[in-house]
A protein has these predicted regions:
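TPR/TPR-like (Sel1-like) alpha-helical repeat modules
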Residues: 83-106, 112-119
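Canonical tetratricopeptide repeat
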Residues: 9, 43, 77, 110-111
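Structural signature of tandem alpha-helical TPR/SEL1-like repeats
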Residues: 17-29, 51-63, 86-96, 121-126
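Mid-chain, well-packed structural core segment of small domains
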Residues: 60-89
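TPR-adjacent "capping" and linker segments in tetratricopeptide-repeat scaffold/adaptor proteins
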Residues: 1-6, 126-128
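Short coil turns that delineate tetratricopeptide repeat
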Residues: 35, 69, 102-103
Length: 129
């Protein structure tokens, strides 16, 4: 039997020591055994985000949003993940929800930055051939 708590502990240790890729290996195994455990999935998403495995982070965060659409922290992480992929228009709804849920001025500032990037992207001239 797999000890999910031990895998989670090791994953957190690796992440805390600056090795998010190493953490992701333990946390992915924990997630295989506990695919709806929000703590495991959040730690896995953070490990993927910190190691720039943004597609993987997005998939895990989407699962977390499906599990609890009202989790402001998950919405914030998903918005940041999408923004980091220059998908600011996709990030904006998640960041707005995070701001509404958390009422955190820093999150509201992220909304403003994402909105500005969306506006800038829409106004940018098309690339020359």
């Amino acid at each position: 039997m797999t000890d999910i708590g031990e895998l989670l502990r090791k994953g957190r240790l690796f992440r805390a020591s600056g090795d998010p890729s190493g953490a992701a290996r333990y946390l992915a195994e924990a997630a295989e055994h506990a695919p709806r455990d929000r703590t495991v999935l959040t730690e896995l998403a953070l490990a993927h985000f910190q190691s720039a495995a943004l597609g993987k982070a997005e998939r895990v965060l989407t699962t977390l949003v499906d599990l609890d659409p009202s989790d402001g922290y998950t919405r914030l992480l998903l918005g940041r993940t999408l923004s980091r992929q220059s998908r600011h228009a996709d990030a904006l709804p998640h960041l707005r929800l995070a701001a509404a849920i958390t009422r955190d001025p820093e999150v509201e500032a992220e909304v403003a930055r994402a909105r500005a990037r969306v506006t800038t992207t829409r106004e940018a001239p098309p690339p020359s051939p």
